[in-house]
Amino acid sequence: MSHNSFGHLFRVTTWGESHGPAIGCVVDGCPPGIPLTEADIQPALDRRRPGQSRFTTQRREADQVRILSGTFEGVTTGTPIALEIQNTDQRSKDYGDIAQRYRPGHADLTYDLKYGIRDYRGGGRSSARETACRVAAGEVARKILGAGITIRAALVRIGPHGIDRSRWDWSQIEANPFFCPDPVAAEQWAVYLDEIRKRGSSVGAVVEVIAEGVPAGLGAPLYGKLDSDLAAALMSINAVKGVEIGDGFDAATLTGEDNADEILAAPNEAGGPHIFGSNHAGGILGGISSGQPVVARFAVKPTSSILIPRRSVGRDGQPVEVITKGRHDPCVGIRAVPVGEAMVACVLADHLLRDRAQNGPR
């Protein structure tokens, strides 16, 4: 199995399976001399960690990260950074019933068709457990980006229920189990998701990621576009079925005069970005960052691991009925919030290093 790495100069390779002894990643391309310890990475992993509310999987993992290489006395050396997270709460017996059955909506069938073998325990390599590695790598990326670039994400929709953007409050993100910026919507979601959970079903969600302080000039025309790399990175997250930048598909409903972000002023003598009248483009024009906030959204499908019987076939081709036991998220979009932040951080760090390599320090 190839394609376990992403990035160009800032390159991340993840490894491990859901029910293996450990998961981890190797981060290559991090410059030397950057302070980095486990304490810098752990808070982000704690945000993604399972079992923190009734609305996420009850699998209990500490997700304690260990730095195995690439630092000396708390500072990066410029060599590959290896990060490891132990798996401690696997329950493989829950998956015995699907060893010879394909779960509808999962990667079981396609993995078997491609490789002729699959690890059915918790989905193996296709499990969202792998995203813990991305979150760890994302914290290394944030150290490269520095404090001037802020990357934050929020859940803006669960199923048919969206937020009221007039109530958007970043301080509410950590005050509820949904990473929701609208406290009223968060209360409504709790009632709705309880109903979904008690039925043994699941529901999808939309995550919005906003990166502020991104300098102008990141990205390149045509095949090196910043937005195409962001879209690819976000689409690679488990269960993601759609990505949009800025207004995305809503841009198709606008006229040219409404969609074009007017440029109101050039930078003053103190520097800073150009001033725009709007940000329909999501901070990227022609594949290159404009200095405005970079805005992306991605849609997460409902997990197919549900207690409601579904029709399928077994490896022998015979019809079967599948009920997925085990511990699963009723809405995987919740824990995708820190994953989205991490992937945006990795892409921005990669493009920042690529820009420096071509143009030198700005």
Curated annotation (Swiss-Prot):
Pathway: Metabolic intermediate biosynthesis; chorismate biosynthesis; chorismate from D-erythrose 4-phosphate and phosphoenolpyruvate: step 7/7. It comes from the Bacteria. Reduced FMN (FMNH(2)). It is an enzyme of class 4 (lyase). GO terms for biological process: amino acid biosynthetic process; aromatic amino acid family biosynthetic process; chorismate biosynthetic process. Its cofactor is FMNH2. The keyword Amino-acid biosynthesis applies. Signal peptide: none annotated. NADP(+) binds at R48, R54. Keywords: Amino-acid biosynthesis, Aromatic amino acid biosynthesis, FAD, Flavoprotein, FMN, Lyase, NADP. FMN binds at R125, S126, S127, N238, A239, G286, K301, P302, T303, S304, S305, R327. Its EC number is 4.2.3.5. InterPro entries: Chorismate_synth, Chorismate_synth_AroC_sf, Chorismate_synthase_CS. It catalyses: 5-O-(1-carboxyvinyl)-3-phosphoshikimate = chorismate + phosphate. GO terms for cellular component: cytosol. Pfam families: Chorismate_synt (PF01264). One of its GO terms (molecular function) is FMN binding. This reaction introduces a second double bond into the aromatic ring system. HAMAP family: Chorismate_synth. Belongs to the chorismate synthase family. Homotetramer. This is Chorismate synthase. It comes from Granulibacter bethesdensis (strain ATCC BAA-1260 / CGDNIH1). The gene is aroC.
